[in-house]
A protein has these predicted regions:
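Acidic-enriched and Gly/Ser
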Residues: 1-5, 12-130
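Conserved catalytic/coupling modules of large nucleotide/cofactor-utilizing molecular machines
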Residues: 231, 249-250, 256-495
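Loop/turn-to-beta-strand initiation segments
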Residues: 173-176, 202-205, 237-241, 290-295
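Conserved glycine(s) of the Walker
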Residues: 156
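Conserved P-loop
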Residues: 159-203
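P-loop NTPase nucleotide-binding/switch module
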Residues: 68-70, 77, 97-145, 150, ...
Length: 495
């Protein structure tokens, strides 16, 4: 093995640094260190000729100048892996940033790993149960698959991610890894404290490439988190839930790096290698014969343009799309998942079974009919609908409320005990609502419950009988509209 030789900086242009080595030119992805204490980290991305390499700085380049000595570390960027990383927060270099004690006993592993070979991949299409009714029934996730979570600010995206972490730990005895790419420092701190209060921190790892860091660090933090996830899958034989926020920021960081490196931009200014870079990250997320990495990724769609190259390349890797609706969030229907916009490739009769598939299709059909009838209701009122259409509206509104669910991670805010609902209980509840078994129950009896059997107890304790409540106005408060009975559907959807 060649002994790394010292080099010297020959040019600095922003985050791009050219270094001269008289012998033993470092290979691609080698990590170089400069500065008095080696605090400036540079990753080699190109070999310009026999003497020069070009790299991108993963740290601020303040204090770097021509002639500064550079040390070749002799290897790629590495991060710690093992049980010791659980409950800790790291940056792209694997340094702890939670103000806790430094790691003592750990092993290092390169962030640049090859995807698992096809021979090791599991070809079974297995359902990944989340314990969340709306997801498990209408858009089931794939074990070892990738789901995109589309949502703006304030619609419950972080709460949904937090609940998935909670359920993964309790239900699967797995490990959860949160990867913040371009994450705001404030959001990262809030999430850390939320996880700590929810009691899920002992079985999770958090890795952040914050918004104020150079593009090189944001570009590599996803690979660092995946390396930790692969250890738990391959060495510990455990299931891993990987949450990425936001995958668009990974592409954006790659675009910045590409521009700094002088590459010719592609469509809309994106890097010409975007497809390859995204595939290198996404293809490592897979289920093997030893375990699975299931990924939930927040996806930002620029200007709501689904033909944007970043969105197109991301969609090609996703097995499920979960769309959060601001309108449903404003009505208090949490989780605010839009059942008509969301979809999953796992929702097929050969995978979930004929009963599950038929129920999901019937639920979507009911919601679609309800959407079409809303305009008529807002203009003419519910009384102008035929008896059959009124039944459709009643079923849809009861299904909407049954698919809401109190979360464990929001108990301290709502005062409601969290519910983990099995797929069988969720399907049974939807089926009984579609059969009109609960047509005499007030809608609010189905709101924020777990299994359908809880509706009877809630109706007795909180509400008057349906025959009396039909003649009464909805209860005042923020949820008045959403708790309205079918007779008040016109009021609830005037806007």
């Amino acid at each position: 093995m060649k002994t790394p030789s010292p080099g010297a900086v020959v040019s600095v242009r922003g985050s791009v640094v050219d270094v001269r080595f008289d012998e033993n030119l470092p290979p691609i992805h080698s990590v170089l260190r400069a500065g008095d204490e080696g605090q400036i980290v540079i990753e080699v991305l190109a070999q310009l000729d026999a003497r020069h390499v070009r790299g991108i700085a993963l740290t601020p380049t303040q204090g770097l100048a021509r002639g500064t000595a550079v040390e070749d570390t002799g290897g790629p960027l590495k991060v710690p892996v093992g049980k010791e990383v659980l409950s800790r927060m790291f940056d792209v270099f694997g340094d702890v940033i939670d103000r806790g004690a430094a790691l003592s006993d750990f092993q290092l592993r390169s962030v640049h790993q090859a995807p698992p070979p096809l021979a090791r991949r599991s070809t079974k299409s297995e359902i990944f149960e989340t314990g969340i009714k709306a997801i498990d029934v209408l858009m089931p996730l794939e074990r070892g698959g990738k789901a995109g979570l589309f949502g703006g600010a304030g619609v419950g995206k972080t709460v949904l991610l937090t609940e998935m972490i909670h359920n993964m730990v309790g239900q699967h005895e797995g490990v959860s890894i949160f990867c913040g790419i371009g994450e705001r420092c404030r959001e990262g701190q809030e999430l850390y404290h939320e996880m700590k209060q929810a009691g899920v921190l002992p079985n999770m790892v958090m890795v952040f490439g914050q918004m104020n860091e150079p593009p090189g660090a944001r570009f590599r933090v996803g690979h660092a988190a995946l390396t930790m996830a692969e250890y738990f899958r391959d060495d510990e034989h455990r299931d891993v839930l990987l949450l990425v926020d936001n995958i668009f920021r990974f592409i954006q960081a790659g675009m910045e790096v590409s521009g700094l490196m002088g590459q010719m931009p592609s469509r809309l200014g994106y890097q010409p290698t975007m497809g390859t870079e995204l595939s290198r990250l996404e293809e490592r997320i897979a289920n093997t014969d030893t375990g699975a990495i299931t990924s939930i990724q927040a996806v930002y769609v620029p200007a709501d343009d689904f033909t944007d190259p970043a969105a197109v390349h991301t969609f090609s890797h996703l097995s499920a799309s979960i769309v959060l609706s601001r309108k449903r969030a404003s009505e208090g229907l949490f989780p605010a998942i839009d059942p008509l916009q969301s979809n999953s490739k796992m929702a097929a009769p050969g995978i979930v079974g004929a009963r599950h598939y038929g129920l999901a299709q019937e639920i979507r059909r009911t919601f679609a009919q309800y959407e079409q009838l809303k305009d008529i209701i807002s203009m003419l009122g519910l009384e102008q609908l035929s008896p059959e259409d009124r039944n459709v509206v009643a079923r849809a509104r009861r299904l909407e409320r049954f698919l809401t669910q109190p979360f464990f991670t929001t108990e301290q805010f709502t005062g409601l005990d969290g519910k983990l609902v099995s797929l069988e209980d969720a399907l049974d509840g939807c089926e009984r609502i579609l059969r009109d078994e609960y047509k005499d129950y007030p809608e609010s009896a189905l709101y924020m419950i777990g299994a359908i059997n809880e509706a009877k107890g809630k109706a007795k304790s909180d509400l008057t009988p349906a025959s009396e409540s039909a003649a009464k106005a909805p209860r005042p408060g923020p949820g008045a509209k959403l708790r309205a009975t079918p007779e008040h559907a016109g009021d609830a959807h005037e806007s």
